[in-house]
């Protein structure tokens, strides 16, 4: 099993897809990496030679911020926004959508499960 940036790549997937299992690499960046290193996107990760694997590892380590480093940077950016008290920081602190989405309905992912409020009871 090929291992890049601390992630085990799936053996049966094409390299173009397998690289997207690394946090910070999507389809477009995956294609860019494969073009720059000269590795065929149609190769399966189980068929990679050690030379190809070394090329990919070197390219990713030198020119990209992925996995742990990228996660730390994103968390640091969020913490900074919370500390300076900007609008986005307040939204992060309150657990609400940050990018202007509506909250009267929807926004359940950020707000969590519904809290039901007891309604008025009918008098007989």
Curated annotation (Swiss-Prot):
InterPro entries: Rbsml_uS13_C, Ribosomal_uS13, Ribosomal_uS13-like_H2TH, Ribosomal_uS13_bac-type, Ribosomal_uS13_CS. GO terms for biological process: translation. Keywords: Ribonucleoprotein, Ribosomal protein, RNA-binding, rRNA-binding, tRNA-binding. Residues 95-124 are annotated as: Disordered. Pfam families: Ribosomal_S13. GO terms for molecular function: rRNA binding; structural constituent of ribosome; tRNA binding. One of its GO terms (cellular component) is cytosol. It comes from the Bacteria. NCBIfam families: uS13_bact. Belongs to the universal ribosomal protein uS13 family. Part of the 30S ribosomal subunit. Forms a loose heterodimer with protein S19. Forms two bridges to the 50S subunit in the 70S ribosome. Located at the top of the head of the 30S subunit, it contacts several helices of the 16S rRNA. In the 70S ribosome it contacts the 23S rRNA (bridge B1a) and protein L5 of the 50S subunit (bridge B1b), connecting the 2 subunits; these bridges are implicated in subunit movement. Contacts the tRNAs in the A and P-sites. This is Small ribosomal subunit protein uS13. It comes from Rhodococcus opacus (strain B4).
């Amino acid at each position: 099993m090929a291992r890049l940036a601390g992630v085990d790549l799936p053996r049966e997937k094409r390299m173009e897809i397998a690289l997207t299992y690394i946090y910070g690499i999507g389809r477009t960046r995956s294609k860019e990496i494969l073009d720059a290193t000269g590795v065929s996107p149609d190769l399966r990760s189980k068929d990679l030679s050690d030379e190809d694997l070394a090329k990919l590892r070197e390219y990713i380590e030198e020119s990209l911020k992925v996995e742990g480093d990228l996660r730390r940077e994103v968390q640091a950016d969020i913490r900074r926004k919370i500390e300076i008290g900007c609008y986005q920081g307040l939204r992060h602190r309150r657990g609400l959508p940050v990018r202007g989405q509506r909250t009267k309905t929807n926004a359940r992912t950020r707000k969590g499960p519904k809290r039901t409020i007891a309604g008025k009871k009918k008098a007989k």
